[in-house]
Amino acid sequence: MTKNLLTKDGQFVVGENKGLVYVLAFLCLALFTYGFIEAVLNRFSNLNASSFVFLIAFIASILFYRKGNSKRVYIRINSKGIYQDERLVTAWANFHNAYINQKEKAITIQDNFQLVVEFLKEGTTQGGRRNIPLTNTQNKSEEEVLEAVKFFWAAYKNKIGN
């Protein structure tokens, strides 16, 4: 799917999945509203631990809303190289390999995928490795990210004649 959209002069951008983030913000706000209405109907006389959970839901809704409005670009891949948060990780001339890895955590309910980029450090013969986290609310899948890396790497190799 992504391969058809990629061009040698274009770029591949990974940001937030705004629809998902706004749905999460709305659900948290609905949870807070339910708790607030219940507290008002009880005239704030019977506040308990669940009342604080509803307050936390309000804070979460604000955070999700701000995240949805963010213009942050997590990963940018183009003909020059791979960028993380608009900072160059490696140019294609120094690129060696990239793959998807899952960071192991003892207790978690979410995936912890990372894009692992292996490269030569600028001006040296030392290798480097950068683990770029792939969020659960990003607008591109792990497979699409890896496909974009392969596409631009192949385009670079064709450009230099390898």
Which residues fall in each region the model found?
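Acidic, Ser/Thr-rich low-complexity segments on the non-lumenal side of membrane proteins
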Residues: 85-124
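Hydrophobic beta-strand residues in large extracellular and virion-surface proteins
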Residues: 14, 75, 82, 98, ...
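Generic detection of short hydrophobic beta-strand segments and adjacent strand-loop junctions
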Residues: 8-14, 90, 130-134
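Conserved beta-hairpin
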Residues: 62-97
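Hydrophobic alpha-helical transmembrane segments
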Residues: 43-56
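N-terminal membrane-targeting/pre-transmembrane regions
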Residues: 1-42
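Alpha-helical transmembrane segments and their membrane-interface exit regions
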Residues: 56-62
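A membrane-cytosol interface segment of integral membrane proteins
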Residues: 115-162
